[in-house]
Amino acid sequence: LNQKKILLRLDLNVPLSNGKITDTTRIDKILPTINFLLKNNAKIVILSHIGRPRGKVVNELSLKPICESLKNKLKKNIKFISKNIKEVNSIDLFDNYDEKIVILENLRFYEEEEKNDTEFAKHLASLADVYVNDAFSCSHRAHASTFEITKFIPSYAGLQLNLEIDALNKITSEIKKPITCIIGGSKISSKINIIKNLIPKFDNIIIVGGMANNVLKFKGHNIGKSIQEDNCDKIIEEIFSLSVKKNCKIIYPEDVTVG
């Protein structure tokens, strides 16, 4: 790793309010990986996304606040590159020998990211010597920076990604009953296969977050303007049907405030 450029894909999709980070959990979790790379004298090029700008530049979704937060936590100088990623090349990244970390702008400012565009992935790969994925929560997506890129650069799992996989292995292969799973998020459609796989293994599954709104709506409750995903009734019906067959109780909120 000595003096190698490491393209580090992280999930720094943290909540922002008026340009301020309101929860740094995702940032805190990736510090061990960054410190490990620094200890081994690597140069780090951080890739991430935040929000859903849908291929357009949205100033409120810039990674600049995340850069400032990392500076404070690591006590290191970090270079933020706001330049169009498609115009950045490897010699633009580090101005001098002492620079160790750079952060590129929000990947989702570019429609090629979510389209899993091959040329965009090739370009990202050209910026470094090695690719490290430490974004477990993004790894189910076939995007240019998580999937296609691995075809063009030596690729490895990061420390946090390995911890997440180990945790999953424990709950799927070393189960001690009775056991309950809590699952949340906003999109139930992206988690349907996970839920179906978990139902036979768990006694109870508690659905929280935005997903719970879809369940409440399915059950006939008025959810007002609360966040929900469209066209999910069939998915939820499948979940409840399978849960009955496998003797798994699906639990969802009963006492809620509707937006």
Annotate each language-model stretch with its function.
Residues 1-259:
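Active-site loop-to-helix "anion-binding N-cap" substructures in soluble metabolic enzymes
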